[in-house]
């Protein structure tokens, strides 16, 4: 299997796939390898664990690291998992199965997704084959899963570690499942892509159409109730909170969903309808209903949303400061402008004067 870090293993032998191994009852400590000087024997715990029947390819797809074995995020995830297994022994089997028994982030993430999304007719082994085979062949997805987990770690104070994001945060997991479904959609495997969309919606409560186009470094905070329509486009470094709807209007085909610019911040329960553009670095306050274009680096709020100010920050999605208080406007917003970037006048009700 093509992995960014670690040695390739052969999981295709019939003996390894005949049955799933029983989980041993003894809790192993990551300190064991320090005492003996040998590498920690993960295979003694999980020699095979619902890995599927992956067929390695002759030309592995690797990220363009100077040293292809160097993957700092995956290295951090493994170190975090070792410490967490020692701090909470009851989770040691779960951590070894989900992270420490795998060779790379792609394989571990495929395992987690497969086991979260499986059902009696979509088996974990089948799903892991699907996820892994897509991830290890696509450089863009390999980059995205790392930039996304970095976004969660940097922007969500509730995200304690990289490992907690890939194991527990449904916004991150739903986003990565979408990325695989999107690739399948572009390959013409639309029925499978829609089946994955349906399972993600059932399990995580997040509905992202596989034809939507979403950039890298995305934070899908909480994720509950997020709906992203078929022709929606989302740029890079965007932060989206729970309950956001990027919906269409009417029943005509073609572009009928919003286009969200780079670095935008969409607050909780925002609804944006139709083929309208949210400019780069724009902020949409929680609970807003947006029915027309929003200028870049502006802030809108209300139902329907109205322009209430501008922001100096390049990417407000990175700071997550979306409370429209007087202190916020005095310190972050540009308090008084006669015109908005397209040259239109700003009405008096849309101005925030400094005192």
From Swiss-Prot:
Activity-regulation annotation: Feedback inhibitions by L-Ser and acetyl-CoA.
Cell compartment(s), UniProt: Cytoplasm
Keywords, in A-Z order: Acyltransferase, Amino-acid biosynthesis, Cytoplasm, Transferase
Chief place where the protein resides: cytoplasm
Pfam families reported for this sequence: Hexapep, SATase_N
Tissue specificity note: Localized in vascular tissues, particularly in phloem.
Pathway: Amino-acid biosynthesis; L-cysteine biosynthesis; L-cysteine from L-serine: step 1/2
Gene induction: By cadmium (Cd). Induced in roots and shoots under sulfur-deficient conditions.
An example Gene Ontology biological process: cysteine biosynthetic process from serine
Oligomer status and interactors: Homomultimer.
Stated family: Belongs to the transferase hexapeptide repeat family.
Listed name of the protein: Serine acetyltransferase 4
Species name: Arabidopsis thaliana
Gene: SAT4
């Amino acid at each position: 299997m093509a992995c960014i870090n670690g040695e390739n293993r052969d999981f295709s032998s019939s003996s390894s796939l005949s049955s799933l191994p029983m989980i041993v009852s003894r809790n192993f400590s990551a300190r064991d390898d320090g005492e003996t000087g040998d590498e920690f024997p993960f295979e003694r715990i999980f020699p095979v664990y619902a890995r599927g029947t992956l067929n390695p390819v002759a030309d592995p797809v690797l990220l363009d690291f100077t040293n292809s074995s160097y993957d700092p995020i995956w290295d951090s995830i493994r170190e975090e998992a070792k410490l967490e297994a020692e701090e909470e022994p009851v989770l040691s089997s779960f951590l070894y199965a989900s992270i420490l028994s795998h060779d790379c982030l792609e394989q571990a993430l495929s395992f987690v997704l497969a086991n979260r999304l499986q059902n009696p007719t979509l088996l974990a082994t089948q799903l892991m084959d699907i996820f892994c085979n897509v991830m290890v062949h696509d450089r863009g997805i390999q980059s995205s899963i790392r930039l996304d987990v970095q976004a969660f770690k940097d922007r969500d104070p509730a995200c304690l570690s990289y490992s907690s994001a890939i194991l527990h945060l449904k916004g991150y997991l739903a986003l990565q499942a979408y990325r695989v479904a999107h690739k399948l959609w572009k390959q013409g495997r639309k029925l499978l892509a829609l089946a994955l969309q349906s399972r993600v919606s059932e399990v995580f409560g997040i509905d992202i159409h596989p034809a939507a186009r979403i950039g890298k470094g995305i934070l899908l905070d909480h994720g509950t109730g997020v709906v992203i329509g078929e022709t929606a486009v989302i740029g890079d470094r965007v932060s989206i909170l729970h309950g956001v709807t990027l919906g269409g209007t009417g029943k005509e085909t073609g572009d009928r969903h919003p286009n969200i610019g780079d670095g935008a911040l969409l607050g909780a329960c925002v609804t944006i309808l139709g083929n309208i553009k949210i400019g780069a670095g724009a902020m949409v306050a929680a609970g807003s209903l947006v029915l027309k274009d929003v200028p870049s680096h502006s802030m809108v709020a209300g139902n329907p949303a109205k322009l209430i100010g501008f922001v100096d920050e390049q990417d407000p999605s990175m700071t997550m400061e979306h409370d429209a208080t007087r202190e916020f406007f005095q310190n972050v917003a540009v308090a008084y402008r006669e015109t908005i970037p397209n040259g239109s006048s700003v009405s008096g009700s849309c101005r925030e004067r400094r005192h």
